[in-house]
Regions:
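N-terminal FAD cofactor-binding segment of flavoenzymes
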Residues: 35-75
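Glycine-rich FAD pyrophosphate-binding loop
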Residues: 6-10, 20-41
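N-terminal Rossmann-fold NAD(P) dinucleotide-binding loop
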Residues: 14-15
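FAD/FMN-dependent oxidoreductases across multiple families
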Residues: 141, 231-314, 318-327, 331-332
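C-terminal helical "tail/cap" subdomain of flavin- and related membrane-associated enzymes
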Residues: 310-442
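Predominantly flavin-linked oxidoreductase catalytic cores and closely associated redox partners
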Residues: 107-249
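Short beta-strand to alpha-helix junction loop
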Residues: 86-106, 228-235
Length: 442
């Protein structure tokens, strides 16, 4: 049996998996299309500290991360600022992606992983519904027992798969955020804002979010503007002008960033394994649907996949029967919650003008709910919390009833998504997929 594993993408998720798989005894090679210096973005992303303990990794060096400040959520009409107000010991880590990626690379290479940069992968090599390796852009064919696709939302490898594998090849544009994140200078003599990290929900009543945060050195303003599906230059400029009116810390000089990115913000794919193939991270849509953050879930999924390969239930660890266990575990522990949060995200994005302002302004949607949703957790309200919400939202009873129905549907979808058939059976798998995807059909 070919024990070679090819990982497509030297991002954080790919490097974490590669190190675990190599330590488990597999031969692992990573191919990355970009230059080493361009793989990770020059900014921070958030992650809970417990992630490292869960996957069995040490914390990165202290110079690689700091602590996130409390978020403040702002509804479209800006009538209220909802501050999360978490104690310091409950705040997320804010990890500097570029040095974090370099640290993960050193761990992977120390384990014996081979990493090739500026080596894009063109397509998967598939015969009789078994993935046998990849073809590089230079025409070289590289055989492998398993291809782990960390190629992101527009993965060329996933797009090249035959329809017979039943894996979604193209992600609908309306299941992605088009995002521009830019760091601007902070003009001199501007006051430190009361709310340092503001997230605008349905910003200026458009389908998306924006944020403005004060950098940790307090010298820059971190501005993200994202819209579902597409974002024109005019849309971006209008949103930026609105943020500038609210936040005097946003100067007119770009310090870094400014790239246009595409991020998946949907429930995980219904199928992300096949014989000799597994999707991992953004390529499987493992991000938190509310905000698009995916480092923590990707790292956890990488450890899950390595564990499954190390303790196969079949003679071939790369068989779909064995890899199915990886998907089932991910969906049980993480994916089910993400599916429920996706339903909440869609409901908020499609809500009528004024609804989000009412829910936040009256406290119907509490700080707790916002915290849970932004972290990708299942939202559960006790009878007492529901009663309290009813009192606060009585003036818009139809909206409140609509929200109550949504919460029940989310609970049902989380249960469905979390309970795949225990063992691989194609008919049962397909039946589960149909049930899982039903609430999201357009």
């Amino acid at each position: 049996m070919n024990k070679n594993i090819i990982v497509v993408g030297a991002n954080q998720t790919g490097l974490v998996f590669a190190a675990f798989a190599k330590t488990a005894g597999f031969d692992v090679t990573v191919y990355e299309a970009k230059k080493q210096c361009d793989v990770a973005y020059d900014w921070t992303d958030d992650m809970v500290e417990e992630t490292f303990e869960e996957v069995g990794m040490p914390l990165p060096p202290k110079e690689i991360y700091t602590r996130k400040r409390n978020w403040t959520f702002v509804p479209p009409e800006k009538g209220v600022n909802v501050l999360m107000d978490l104690p310091d010991d409950q705040l997320d880590m804010a990890i500097y992606r570029r040095p974090f990626n370099a640290w993960l690379l050193s761990r992977a290479e120390c384990a014996g992983v081979k990493v090739f940069y500026e080596t894009p992968v063109k397509r998967a090599i598939v015969e009789n519904d078994v993935v046998l390796g990849v073809e590089l852009e230079n025409g070289e064919v590289v055989p492998a027992g398993l291809v782990v696709d960390c190629g992101g939302v527009i993965s060329a490898v996933r797009k090249s798969l035959p329809e017979s594998l039943k894996i979604t090849r193209n992600i609908d544009k309306n299941d992605t955020f088009i995002v521009r994140r830019t760091f601007f200078n902070r003009p001199e003599n501007t006051a430190r804002p009361k709310y340092t990290n503001r997230a605008y929900l349905k910003h200026i009543n458009e389908r998306g979010i924006s944020w403005c945060t004060l950098s940790h050195d307090e010298k820059q303003a971190d501005v993200l503007i994202g819209r579902v599906g597409e974002m024109s230059d005019k849309t971006y400029e209008n949103a930026l002008a609105d943020i500038r009116r609210d936040n005097e810390i946003v100067g007119d000089k770009i310090v870094t960033g400014g790239q246009l990115l595409q991020i998946p913000v949907r429930h995980p794919l219904s199928r992300f394994v096949a014989n000799g193939y597994a999707l991992l991270g953004d390529s499987a849509c493992m991000t938190i649907p509310m905000l698009g953050s995916g480092m923590a879930s990707g790292m956890k999924a990488g450890k899950m996949l390595s564990d499954v390969l190390s303790s196969p239930v079949t003679e071939n660890p790369f068989s779909v029967e064995n890899l199915y266990r990886y998907q089932a575990r991910f969906m049980k522990e993480i994916g089910g919650k993400h599916a429920a949060v996706d339903m909440m995200k869609n409901w908020l994005l499609n809500s009528k003008k004024g609804d989000v302002d009412f829910l936040l302004g009256k406290g119907v949607v509490s700080r707790k709910v916002l915290i849970e949703a932004s972290a990708g957790h299942m939202i559960v309200m006790s009878p007492a919390e529901m009663a309290q919400a009813a009192v606060k939202g009585i003036k818009k009873l139809p909206l409140l009833l609509n929200l109550a129905v949504l919460l029940q549907k989310m609970k049902k979808e989380c249960k469905t998504a979390s309970n795949m058939p225990k063992y691989y059976d194609e008919a049962a798998f397909s039946k589960w997929e149909e049930k899982y995807e039903k609430p999201f059909r357009k």
